[in-house]
């Protein structure tokens, strides 16, 4: 989602609250609980969940391993749910022509550096760069080139579904900033 007025443009960045993250968090949570309960059921020699039978599973070694995998999966699921709740990675890119400032804001993990805020001068922006790698794991990233700085990614790897969307976004931004486009 973009917001553009005469001299100000704001590009909002979706963080970790994506449908894919919700799906993975649910899959991991239920899978890990299933593993843990089957492993623990093999220890008790009693089915804790009626449709997950543990009668044929010996506690040592299979039950212990299933409990371990279940606990590990619960930790990973907890991590995913925390990033979703904190909305890590969300924020905005703000281009203010009146003040001549380009700002990047992102939410991070809790702590003293939770708010990540970086500013650059718009006059130092040299160009917009597109990086495209096609194939099985395609990668499409939009960068901004600034004098004396490494290229700064403006988008996440999975943000653009098509090359056309990426080209349109790069052209819009380059037109607004009056800079050139590199890549492709």
Curated annotation (Swiss-Prot):
Keywords: Chloroplast, Membrane, Photosynthesis, Plastid, Thylakoid, Transmembrane, Transmembrane helix. It comes from the Eukaryota. It is a multi-pass membrane protein. Its main location: plastid. The keyword Thylakoid applies. It is found in: Plastid, Chloroplast thylakoid membrane. One of its GO terms (biological process) is photosynthesis. HAMAP family: Ycf4 (MF_00437). Seems to be required for the assembly of the photosystem I complex. Belongs to the Ycf4 family. This is Photosystem I assembly protein Ycf4.
